[in-house]
Amino acid sequence: MDGKGKIVIYCSASYDIDQKYNQAAREVVRAACSLGYGIVSGGTVKGTMGVVADEVVRCGGTHTGVLPGFMAEYLYPALDKVVWTDTMAERKEAMREGTVAAIALPGGIGTLDELIGTLTLAKLGKYSGKVIAFDYDGFFEPLKALLEHYVSAGMMDTGTLELLHLPRTAEEVAALLK
């Protein structure tokens, strides 16, 4: 089920996060699958990545996992397709490739790296999909404030900030994907 294309979901590998974020992740996956999108993710069983993978299976969606060989022990067993890379940099590129949107769920430093990298590529005209940070429970408000600071300091133009969508509900994410 990826008739509308694929979206990449960036998310946490941590098991220690508040479960409300995992529930929010499930809602985003259900919304994307119901609209006919295939999912691309980090492809592991760890943390929210595993939650995303489980929800794609429950929804009957298609799921491509992208991971470097050194993470093979964490491979989610029920992926439709696995893309192996040598490095984390290659992983990020392979995850984005051919997607129509990139959604960052609340996550850690890896998620932030993926989100900012994708936003940078969008600014440079090298990523044409939508860049979405799911601002569930205000999670990305500090990032928004930092980016606004960059704009006010003249380090970044407002056009870059305008490329970043910050929906607060799964319904708002779905509206951006329609």
Regions found by a protein language model. Name each.
Residues 67, 105, 121-144, 158-160:
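Short, acidic/small-residue loops that bind anionic groups at enzyme active sites
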Residues 47-51, 139-148:
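Glycine-rich, charge-decorated loop segments at or immediately adjacent to ligand/cofactor-binding or catalytic sites
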Residues 18-20, 112-115:
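Glycine/threonine-rich flexible loop motifs
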Residues 50-56, 114-124:
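Short Gly/Thr/Asp-enriched flexible loops that form oxyanion-binding sites at enzyme active sites
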Residues 1-61:
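Glycine-rich beta-alpha loop segments
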Residues 101, 152-178:
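A charged, well-structured terminal subsegment
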Residues 43-105, 110:
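Acidic/glycine-enriched connector segments
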